[in-house]
Curated annotation (Swiss-Prot):
Family to which this protein belongs: Belongs to the bacterial ribosomal protein bS20 family.
Listed GO CC annotations: cytosol; small ribosomal subunit
One Pfam family this sequence matches: Ribosomal_S20p
Organism domain of life: Bacteria
Ranges for region Disordered: 1-28
InterPro entries assigned: Ribosomal_bS20 (IPR002583), Ribosomal_bS20_sf (IPR036510)
Alphabetized GO MF terms: small ribosomal subunit rRNA binding; structural constituent of ribosome
Name recorded for this polypeptide: Small ribosomal subunit protein bS20
Function: Binds directly to 16S ribosomal RNA.
Length: 90
C-alpha cells in the first residue's frame, strides 16, 4: 500500500506500463511464431512478409527497452537464416 501521493502515482504508472509492455511483448512473440510456422509449412511468401513485420516489431521493442538490442538482432538473424535455409532446400 503506497504511503505517499507520489508512490500512488508510481503504482498507477507501473501498472499501466506493465500492461502495455505485456501486450507489445505478446504481439511480438506472436509475429515471430507466425514466421516460424510459415517456414515449417514451406510457405515462403508468407514467411517473408511476416518477417518484415517481425523485424519492425523487434526493432520497436528494442528501442523501447522492452528487449535488449542484441536480443532483437539475434532473433532477426535466426529468423532470416530459417527463411534462407528453407528457400535453398525448396
Amino acid at each position: 500500500m503506497p504511503n505517499t501521493s507520489s508512490a500512488s502515482k508510481r503504482l498507477r504508472q507501473n501498472e499501466k506500463r506493465r500492461l502495455l509492455n505485456r501486450a507489445t511483448r505478446s504481439n511480438m512473440r506472436s509475429t515471430i511464431r507466425r514466421v516460424r510456422e510459415a517456414v515449417e509449412n514451406n510457405d515462403l511468401e508468407t514467411a517473408k512478409n511476416e518477417f518484415k513485420v517481425a523485424q519492425k516489431k523487434l526493432d520497436r521493442a528494442a528501442a523501447n527497452n522492452l528487449i535488449h538490442k542484441n536480443a532483437a538482432a539475434r532473433t532477426k538473424s535466426r529468423l532470416n537464416n530459417l527463411i534462407k535455409n528453407a528457400a535453398q532446400t525448396a
